[in-house]
């Protein structure tokens, strides 16, 4: 074995090698970065009524589930729907004649909501050490004025009506301006205080809001493979939401109109997962990514129509290969007893074997691409990817394109520098240049991306010795 020794001055604050990712996606990880994860598959289907001959055993295929496949009191997940959680203000089915808890967020009682929400959280998650995913599912209204189109336009209309009643002598321009600000302020208070409550009560859970980030549904129709710049701006403007989240829950659901379009579905799913990773990198590097999907196109009306293998490849398989934290398979409880046999047959004959095949291919990639020392992942979506299309997230202390190097701490010298002196050393002699920062977001955005990363520089203090062994 050939040993190459290199002395590098690295500030004591870093202690061990920091995470460095080069332009082709290869990484090395020191103790200051988390270990690479394998993608879990979570069964968020309320199939607990399925018993006896129709009992559904998902664990034999490596799928995680709550105990007895219940939605309450489990260890893997908890989900809170606006209709039965706290006192969320909304118009039922966006109908102004059926306001719930005030209808508009501006008219809701935040304190009453938080008091009831605390009871609901403690009931649904009795374990104070719960470390699963906690999903806040509020879909009746959207937390931003610019996202309130289509059926959600009612919240704009009613906000303007409310402002006009409060300030009848204002001009229409003043009324519309204030209505937008008032609506967004109320939305942010409800969303932020709710997730803060959850984090305070169950601090180990991964908290976030379902359906965010978002992407335009027509991506791919004009040969593009990314979410539009408009939707990227929408997501950038939700920086206040990302600042409070510890998990991101995008949805790659397919519907009956998608049945015969697996290629289009692949582009859609890949674009949203890529956009979610962009949000994570720019705004919440500590957030986990849990992608929601289904296995039925419409479990309400056609429960016997399940995803084809091509559409499994466009959703679940792609998310696993892009190495998200988990893929969450969701379904409704409606008519669940009559659907038990259908679910069991699909699980045993299609979904389960498909997941096993994906797992075997990813294990082969780990061994051959990453030398068994890290996780394979696709940096970007690609149909029928070859081994060389994958990159590696290496287990510490390994690093390199194929996790072929091993880093070892030898010692320290002198005192710890001040945080302002902290720099990542230039090790370009051994690695390709780091990938460009994503912090340069358009000045037209309402918010600027925070600087989450250190810049390389020559102003380094006394550091430690690093031995690189190949």
Regions found by a protein language model. Name each.
Residues 64-65, 120, 226-239, 270-280, ...:
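Alpha-helical scaffolding within the catalytic cores
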Residues 376-378, 382-396:
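Extracellular cysteine-rich, disulfide-stabilized repeat modules
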Residues 37-51, 75-78, 83, 246, ...:
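Substrate-binding cleft of secreted/luminal carbohydrate-active enzymes
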Residues 75-77, 81-90, 94, 140, ...:
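Aromatic- and acid-rich polysaccharide-binding/catalytic face
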Residues 2, 13-39, 470:
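N-terminal signal peptide
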Residues 365-372:
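Disulfide-braced loops of extracellular cysteine-rich modules
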Residues 175-234, 284-298:
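Aromatic-lined carbohydrate-recognition surfaces of secreted/lumenal glycan-active proteins
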